[in-house]
UniProtKB/Swiss-Prot annotation:
D-glyceraldehyde 3-phosphate binds at S152, C153, T154, T183, R198, T211, G212, R234. This is Glyceraldehyde-3-phosphate dehydrogenase. Pathway: Carbohydrate degradation; glycolysis; pyruvate from D-glyceraldehyde 3-phosphate: step 1/5. Signal peptide: none annotated. It catalyses: D-glyceraldehyde 3-phosphate + phosphate + NAD(+) = (2R)-3-phospho-glyceroyl phosphate + NADH + H(+). The gene is gap. The keyword Metal-binding does not apply. InterPro entries: GlycerAld/Erythrose_P_DH (IPR020831), GlycerAld_3-P_DH_AS (IPR020830), GlycerAld_3-P_DH_cat (IPR020829), GlycerAld_3-P_DH_NAD(P)-bd (IPR020828), Glyceraldehyde-3-P_DH_1 (IPR006424), NAD(P)-bd_dom_sf (IPR036291). Belongs to the glyceraldehyde-3-phosphate dehydrogenase family. Keywords: Cytoplasm, Glycolysis, NAD, Nucleotide-binding, Oxidoreductase. One of its GO terms (cellular component) is cytoplasm.
């Protein structure tokens, strides 16, 4: 049975999710989209993408819909989710990717509008649960989890390697830095922003800013609560990021033992989520990689019981594929 999906917010993640469904899923079908932008613009941005390239199917539009490969997708432009008629399209799951309805108390309006489940594509508040596929997805409970979060792209990178390393060696405490591609929340030129660092031109600066990813790991790995913190360095690349984690273990380890633990996990139960590489990667090498986390074995460093590791991630496509896996899990339990 095909599960019917609605997307609220047809921006970077919304459009990437649409592409991921087309490319990778036989079980999901996007039947409706809500975005305040006009349909001509939405169809153009779906058809042509500066990172992903041209969509391999014909895209057309009219006043009420976008048609992709001959399939019509209804399009709405409602500011308030409660005014959406998901029921009219038999929508089962809504991907909430506007960035505005990260409070589950607001996002549950999608359920009131006819959907069965809501997945927020960002860190959330008041959600029923937060999941990183491959880390804690097996705790998903369809009876009690109706509005859930797929966490952030950085948490989806950090959590898989943190789980493996904590289970194997024990993380006492640690600090992380994500070297992160710039995003739409930054300014192209110097211009006002509530974060004065993000107010500076994104394409010519390294921009230090906050990330909640380290603390959010505790939502999917409670055993690490209070043990990790960190920040982000936004850099002038359009996508392709890396998470640097430095941590202390309970006993001395070696580069070889750290890498072996990750490699074993990557070829085993974490295969879709966590990859292991001994190649001399740079950021463009991992663009359009579907893993949430791509461990770079050549960058592992050890001094006594202090360890530094790095994992890459395509902060758009890799995260979207993680979101797709989570959506397929939810769909399988409807």
């Amino acid at each position: 049975m095909t599960i019917r999906v609605g997307i609220n917010g047809f921006g970077r993640i919304g459009r990437n999710f649409f592409r991921a469904v087309l490319e990778r899923s036989d079980d999901l079908e996007v039947v409706a989209v809500n975005d305040l932008t006009d349909n001509k613009t939405l169809s153009t941005l779906l058809k042509f993408d500066s990172i992903m390239g041209r969509l391999g199917q014909e895209v057309e539009y009219d006043d009420d819909s976008i048609t992709v490969g001959g399939k019509r997708i209804a399009v709405y432009a409602e500011r308030d989710p409660k005014n959406l008629d998901w029921a009219a399209h038999n929508v089962d799951i809504v991907i909430e990717s506007t960035g505005f309805f990260t409070d589950a108390n607001a996002a549950k309006a999608h359920i009131e509008a006819g959907a069965k489940k809501v997945i927020i594509s960002a860190p959330a508040s008041n959600e029923d649960a937060t999941f990183v596929y491959g880390v804690n997805h097996e705790s998903y409970d369809p009876e009690n989890h109706n509005v859930i979060s797929g966490a952030s792209c950085t948490t989806n990178c950090l959590a898989p390697m943190a789980k493996v390393l904590n289970d194997k060696f024990g993380i006492e405490n640690g600090l992380m830095t994500t070297v992160h591609a710039y995003t739409g929340d930054q300014r192209l030129h110097d211009a006002p922003h509530r974060d004065l660092r993000r107010a500076r031109a994104a394409a010519v600066n390294i921009v230090p800013t906050s990330t909640g990813a380290a603390k959010a790991v505790a939502l999917v790995l409670p055993e690490l609560k209070g043990k990790l913190d960190g920040y982000a360095l936004r850099v002038p690349v359009i996508t392709g990021s890396a998470t640097d984690l430095t941590f202390n273990t309970k006993s001395e380890v070696t580069v070889e033992s750290i890498n072996a633990a990750i490699k074993e996990a990557a070829v085993g139960e974490f295969g879709e989520t966590l990859a292991y590489s001994e190649e001399p990667l740079v950021s463009t090498d991992i663009v359009h990689d579907s893993h949430g986390s791509i461990f770079d074995a050549g960058l592992t460093k050890v001094s006594g019981n202090t360890v530094k590791v790095v994992s890459w991630y395509d902060n758009e496509w890799g995260y979207t594929c993680q979101l797709l896996r989570l959506t397929e899990l939810v769909a399988s339990k409807l």
